[in-house]
Amino acid sequence: MANTVIVGTQWGDEGKGKIVDMLAEQAGAIVRFQGGNNAGHTLVVEGEQCILHLIPSGVLHQGKKCLIGNGVVLDPEVFLKEIDGLAEKGVDVSPERLMISKKTQIIMPYHKLMDNCRESLKSADNKIGTTGRGIGPCYEDKMNRCGIRAADLADPELLREKIVAGLQEKNVLFEKLFNVEALDAEKVYQEMLPIAERVKPYLADVSSIIQDVNKEGKDVLFEGAQGVHLDIDHGTYPFVTSSNVVSGNAAAGAGCGPRQLERIIGICKAYTTRVGAGPFPTELFDETGDTLQKNGHEFGATTGRKRRCGWLDMVVLRETARLCDLTEFALTKLDVLSGLKEIEICVAYEYRGEKVDYPPQEQNGMAHVKPVYESMPGWDEDITKASSYDELPEAARNYIARIEELSGVKVGIVSVGPDRAQTIVR
């Protein structure tokens, strides 16, 4: 299979979990390299749904190592809740196969409080649409070099020291700026101790494990979260997440060299969705948008929020292909387009009187573009039982071919339904 990176090509929710679950069979290890539990990866195996927020999507494949890299921010309570839920289903979640990098940053209670306090102060027009799970404040502490790392959970005195230091500044903000009660450092520490005890067995040197897996002749699957256009640097800033989502961060966020990243698959929904605030050039506000939302079951796996829906945006995909050096696309939810008489594809933007093929670089530039559309005939056939590319309707194959022409990237995988088996590999 080769060491493979999975990235979302749009604004998240592209169906990465399903593709990771499918490819995990061929991998020796699956590693999450960025983000936190602000992402929800939904797996459906033989009709049974499983939603994961932190644990790699390959966990349902027994015997595969599942790793959480140093680029992730981990909420230990969510982690423990997930392993307990998986254990109830009979899934092996022992420390022998599930491991957390000792360098992973830990989301603390005060990060979540800070996240919600900040969002509450913003006007309706300035809200980012954060999930309120403490992701941003945790990354902020990491950059300020005062964060709590997973290894600190095994050192009670250092843990207490860091909690006390961390709350000195934050409590001033809570009381003076946000008008909420300050947190008691000792209470936070005492509440963390039993959690730390349960997490400690899972701590490991993830970087070395990745090297060992490759030395054994096995491949590693790098699982990204969110989407490239939520990337802190390359996304629709400031309506972005707090980490680098691009494929290049797989090396830094997992602890390996860039030459170990051999195959880069961009997961692409057959239309476009976005959760929360931020520019969305191809968003639909009509009956077609409602149809996509309904037929695609477009509700966030993490927040339950209704997703905004629109036509496929090739400007967005072209930019992702450039930023991530994609080797192929995995096209998901193609079945949702069945029944549409006509399908629109955004092939370019009009921006400041010019036609552009890539997103503008200026802040909020995407809010001022006009999509240039190309129409293609749709298809009526139910494609959910198609098991080969040739079984797809001609119009569906033409749609895929046009995506390849406009992006210069091959569509190597086509998903025609939520179940693992409803996947066509070309």
From Swiss-Prot:
Signal peptide: none annotated. Keywords: Cytoplasm, GTP-binding, Ligase, Magnesium, Metal-binding, Nucleotide-binding, Purine biosynthesis. GO terms for cellular component: cytoplasm. Pathway: Purine metabolism; AMP biosynthesis via de novo pathway; AMP from IMP: step 1/2. Plays an important role in the de novo pathway of purine nucleotide biosynthesis. Catalyzes the first committed step in the biosynthesis of AMP from IMP. Belongs to the adenylosuccinate synthetase family. This is Adenylosuccinate synthetase. It comes from Maridesulfovibrio salexigens (strain ATCC 14822 / DSM 2638 / NCIMB 8403 / VKM B-1763). The lineage of its organism: Bacteria, Pseudomonadati, Thermodesulfobacteriota, Desulfovibrionia, Desulfovibrionales.
